[in-house]
């Protein structure tokens, strides 16, 4: 199944604050996420529609909308992800 990946303004700002090699790695993973949801993806327990994707020390927090669209809300270091 193909997905459209949209980044919220806060997620774009988060990516801009990362080092280039980390941002590039996350961008590659988001590109692969368009075609399949494999990888370390888990549904967050206390949130109904939100998921997290683990990319090394970083977490990509996103929501799946209408089974065709992925909305990325945040890209944060793991120590800040669940606050």
What positions do the PLM features span?
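Enriched for short, Lys/Arg-rich terminal
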Residues: 2-5, 9, 13-24, 38, ...
């Amino acid at each position: 199944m193909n997905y459209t990946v949209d980044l919220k303004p806060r997620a774009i700002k988060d990516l801009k604050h990362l080092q280039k090699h980390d941002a590039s790695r996350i961008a590659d993973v988001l590109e692969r996420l368009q075609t399949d949801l494999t990888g370390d993806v888990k549904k967050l327990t206390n949130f109904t529609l939100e998921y997290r994707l683990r990319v090394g020390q970083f977490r990509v927090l996103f929501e799946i909308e209408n089974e065709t669209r992925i909305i990325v809300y945040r890209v944060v270091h793991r120590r800040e992800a669940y606050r």
